[in-house]
Amino acid sequence: MTQKISTEKEAVLDAETRMREDARSRRVVLVCHCLLDGNAKVWERARYSGDFTAVTDIIQKKGYGILQLPCPELLYFGANRYWGGKNVFDSAGFRRFCREKARETADYIENYNKVGVKAVCVLGCDGSPTCGVSHTNFYDNGGGRPKTLMRRVIPGKGIFMEELEKELKERNLPVPDFVGLGMDLFSDSTEAIVEEFRKYMEGK
């Protein structure tokens, strides 16, 4: 009996030691779904075959966790969806769906926040109608008979990013930096985009 109690005490002490030696960084980066899976991109918009390794390597070298955000477009419109601008996608139903996904994402941040895990940033995809951060897109001639659409890049967040920021503010949670990689702008090279992100992460 004495031996059993001694073994149980040793097990408790061993567990406490492991907890003290916990290696987690207490830092996490929330990453736009398609940056971790190019298969989620709308057709003809993927610049990489799988994940955007050059970007994920930067995050992993810092020792930070990566939380993959949902892709509202893929879930709502499907994998074989047409290209679309923010003005085309911004229906009451799709915005409500984005808000639901924003609430789920905010739950992660809220739970992390309670135990001291910091969301370093939200990494979006500039030029996306849903996950753009500083720039989204707009189609002047959307709707009606199928045709070639005239695409414009305009300042502002995509629908999901708007709803996520709004949800965090409504919960009085810390709002992390929203950082946009210009992967859907096609004005900068992939190398330039990666270098800009690398410099940003140096200070994080």
Regions found by a protein language model. Give the residues of each.
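Glycine- and acidic-residue-enriched helix-capping/strand-helix junction motifs
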Residues: 41-52, 145-157
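Divalent-metal-activated hydrolytic enzyme cores
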Residues: 7-10, 15, 24, 62, ...
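Short loop/turn segments at strand-loop or loop-helix junctions that form parts
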Residues: 32-35, 70-73, 125-129, 135-136
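Active-site and ligand/interface coordination hotspots across diverse enzymes
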Residues: 1-45
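A structural signal for short, well-ordered beta-strand segments and their strand-loop junctions
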Residues: 30, 66-70, 118-125, 177-182
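Short catalytic/ligand-binding loop motif for oxyanion handling, primarily in non-cytosolic enzymes
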Residues: 38-39, 76-78, 128-134, 186-189
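Internal, conserved structured core segments that host functional sites
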Residues: 121-142, 149
